[in-house]
Swiss-Prot record:
It holds the Pfam family MraY_sig1. It is a multi-pass membrane protein. The lineage of its organism: Bacteria, Pseudomonadati, Pseudomonadota, Alphaproteobacteria, Hyphomicrobiales. PROSITE patterns: MRAY_1, MRAY_2. One of its GO terms (cellular component) is plasma membrane. InterPro entries: Glycosyl_transferase_4, PNAcMuramoyl-5peptid_Trfase, PNAcMuramoyl-5peptid_Trfase_CS. This is Phospho-N-acetylmuramoyl-pentapeptide-transferase. Signal peptide: none annotated. It comes from the Bacteria. The keyword Transport does not apply. GO terms for biological process: cell division; cell wall organization; peptidoglycan biosynthetic process; regulation of cell shape. The chain crosses the membrane at residues 27-47, 72-92, 94-114, 135-155, 169-189, 200-220, 237-257, 264-284, 289-309, 338-358.
Length: 361
């Protein structure tokens, strides 16, 4: 919204800064951070009052969780999403279609997660919205988003998959790209959702991934930098750096309240939405495969659940003591802070590896 002030730079030279994505990204970070800081306590109090017993805790998990996490309110993702929306509307170029596509997926997935959390809290059970129904709605939202991205992007490129390390290798999937893109977004949303099981575990890797993809979006949306790095130029996609900045700011604000012992959980409201946001940015910037590297921690968590379920159904035996894998390490004797901080370190290393693919080609 504030970008229009740049039109008056002739009369007010200082307004010229609103043209720059870097400046507006910084503004989005600060705005989202302050918003969550200021309104977070009130939102947490409201959630605690409305929810009563808070998020139901798994009885088959680590016994310490029954003592340390009981009564903690969920749906804290509302804080994050509010910060993202306010900062994006204030600092992003609202005429950019990519901005609305990413916001649409984020809020759509957030609504799914909110309803899921609502069912769990009101019924005090882990059985919220059925898995099939949830995946079906997610697929519809993601499918619409991908079709829009395909329609506004450059013909040929918008339906192709780019591969890291190979500057000229593109696999044009044609209309089948809609299925691939839909899978990326839905998988990202659910992978982040599975990661959100310990205080602070999901939000920091999400911020790391958002920072990485904000950087990628800025480079891919700049014809000079894209040409220098020999990555595919996508006109207009640089504006997504502002949304990624908003996520980072809102995430930092949320972490203040989510640091152990957490005052609030983001719930499916936040985890599904943030994962969907990252997946959509990856599709728009043509870095879907790089998302699997930068977000490798989320992939690991999701794969651990798949392996556990498949193994148990086929052999009756479990590969891990408990899935997702962060609970496996808890069962091995790692303390919650050890698991969380070590997983953060893994997320940083994977992000650096993913960013290295921009140059190693």
């Amino acid at each position: 919204m504030l970008q229009w002030l740049a039109e008056f730079h002739a009369s007010f030279p200082a307004f010229n800064v609103f043209r720059y994505i870097t400046f507006r990204t910084g503004g989005a970070v600060v705005t989202a951070l302050l918003f969550v800081f200021l309104f977070g306590p009130g939102m947490i109090s409201t959630l605690r009052l409305k929810q009563g017993k808070g998020q139901p805790i798994r009885t088959d998990g680590p016994q310490s969780h029954l003592l340390t996490k009981k009564g903690t309110p969920t749906m804290g993702g509302l804080m994050i999403l509010s910060g993202i929306v306010v900062a994006t509307l204030l600092w992003a170029n609202l005429s950019n279609p990519y901005v609305w596509v990413v916001l649409g997926v984020t809020l759509g997935f957030g609504l799914i997660g909110f309803y899921d959390d609502y069912l769990k809290v009101t019924k005090q059970t882990h059985n919220g919205l059925s898995g099939k129904a949830r995946l079906a709605i997610e697929a519809v939202i993601a499918g619409v988003a991908v079709v829009i991205v395909m329609s506004v992007g450059k013909p040929g490129l918008s339906t192709s998959v780019a591969f890291p390390f190979f500057k000229d290798l593109l696999l044009n999937l044609g209309m089948f790209f809609a299925i691939f893109g839909m899978f990326v977004i839905v998988a990202a949303g659910n992978a982040v959702n599975l990661t959100d099981g310990l205080d602070g575990l999901a939000i920091v890797p999400v911020m790391i991934a958002a920072g990485s993809f904000g950087f990628i979006a800025y480079l891919a949306g700049n014809v000079v930098f894209a040409d220098y790095l020999q990555i595919h130029y996508v006109a207009g996609v640089g504006e997504l750096a502002v949304i990624c900045g908003a996520l980072m700011g809102a995430g930092l604000g949320f972490l203040w309240f989510n640091a152990p012992p957490a005052q609030v959980f983001m719930g499916d409201t936040g985890s599904l939405a943030l994962g969907g946001l990252l997946g959509t940015v990856a599709v728009a910037t043509k870095h879907e495969i790089v998302l699997a590297v930068i977000g490798g921690l989320f992939v690991l968590e999701a794969v651990s659940v798949i392996v556990q379920v498949v193994s148990f159904k086929l052999t009756g035996k479990r590969v891990f003591k408990m899935a997702p894998i962060h609970h496996h390490f808890e069962q091995l004797g790692w303390t919650e802070p050890q698991v969380v901080i070590r997983f953060w370190i893994v997320a940083v290393v994977l992000a650096l590896a993913g960013l290295a693919t921009l140059k190693l080609r």
